[in-house]
Amino acid sequence: MFSSLYPLARASLFKMDAEDAHHLTLRALGAAGRTGLACALSARVPDAPRTVMGLTFRNPVGLAAGLDKDGAAIDGLAALGFGFIEVGTVTPRPQPGNPRPRMFRLPQAEALINRMGFNNHGVDQFVKNVQAARYRGILGLNIGKNADTPIERAAEDYLYCLERVYPFASYVTINISSPNTKNLRQLQGAGELDALLAALKDKQQRLADLHGKLVPLALKIAPDLDDEQVKEIGDTLLRHKIEAVIATNTTLSRAAVQGLPHADEAGGLSGRPVFDASNEVIRKLHAEVGNDVPIIGVGGIFSGEDAHAKLAAGAALVQLYTGFIYRGPALVSECVKAIARERSA
C-alpha cells in the first residue's frame, strides 16, 4: 500500500528542507512500528534467502546505515520488505553533528549531498531503541567515533561501542569512511587499519567467549580509493579474517554534478553519480579477496538492473539509501525480483 502512495508523499516531502523531510519520515515510520500500524506499510516482497557471514538473509536487499541513525524506526522500516536493516552510525557519546543546513538534494542527478557528521543520541540510547524493537530479522549496527575524540584514540571509541552493541547485533559495521568526521578516513591507511582491526578482532573474540556467540564484523570503506589502497585494504581484511566489507560510502568527487545547484556544498555525495565508482571498487576488491570476504554493495542503486550489476561486480548482498529516498519502497521489491530472475536464468 505504502509503495503505491509513495510518489504522492515524495512530492510533498521534496518541497520541504531535506533534513526536515528526513526526520518527518522517520517519526512516521517509528510511530507506525510502535503502534502496530506497520502492517499497513507491509510490502509484498518475495523471499530470496541467501547465507552470508554465516547469517541467513530473507532476501539480499538491505537498508544502508544513515537513514535511521538512532535505531528509532526499526519496526516501521522492516515492514517495507528489506532483507536486512542496518542502523547507525552511533558514537559513544551523544553529539549534534555539523551545523545545519547539512543535507541537500540534487534531483537533476538523483543525488544527495550530506555533511551530517554522525549526529546521534549516543550508544546508550541507541541500545535501548534496538532492544525495544520487535524486529527479529538480520540487524546490522553501525559504529563510529565521536568528533572530539583524537584520531590517535579512535580505537577506544570503536571498542567501547562494539562492547555495548555486541549482544544485540546480527553483525557490527565499523564505519571508517564517512567524509564528514575530520581525519576519519585516515583509518583506511594500511598501518592505521591494521592496528584498528587487530584490536577489534581481539575484542570480538573476547565478547564471543562472554556471550556465547560470534557476531560478524563488517568494514565500511570509501569509493575514493586508488588501486594500491584497495589492494592494501583487501590484504588487511584477509589477514584479520574480517567477516565482510561494505563498499561503498559517499564520495567527495563532484565530477558528475558540476554546475548543478548545491554541487559545491561540502560533504559526501550519494546516489546515481556514485554508482560506477562504487562498482569499480567492488570489482577491484573482489579481485583481491574473492569469496573469502563477502562484499555488501551500496551506492547508486535505482533499479533492479542496478542491484544485479552490484552482484555481477562481486557483491554478495546490496543496500539501498538514496535510491530508496527517490524511488520509495517499490525499489526493494524490484531489486529482489531482478536478482532472483538473474539467479534462476
UniProtKB/Swiss-Prot annotation:
Where FMN is bound, by residue? 65-69, 89, 142, 175, 220, 248, 271, 300, 321-322
What's the encoding gene here?
pyrD
- What cofactor is needed? FMN
Species lineage: Bacteria, Pseudomonadati, Pseudomonadota, Betaproteobacteria, Burkholderiales
Keywords assigned by UniProt, alphabetized: Cell membrane, Flavoprotein, FMN, Membrane, Oxidoreductase, Pyrimidine biosynthesis
What's its job?
Answer: Catalyzes the conversion of dihydroorotate to orotate with quinone as electron acceptor.
The protein's name is Dihydroorotate dehydrogenase (quinone)
Quaternary assembly? Monomer.
**One Gene Ontology term of the molecular function aspect:** dihydroorotate dehydrogenase (quinone) activity
Q: Which organism is it from?
A: Burkholderia cenocepacia (strain HI2424)
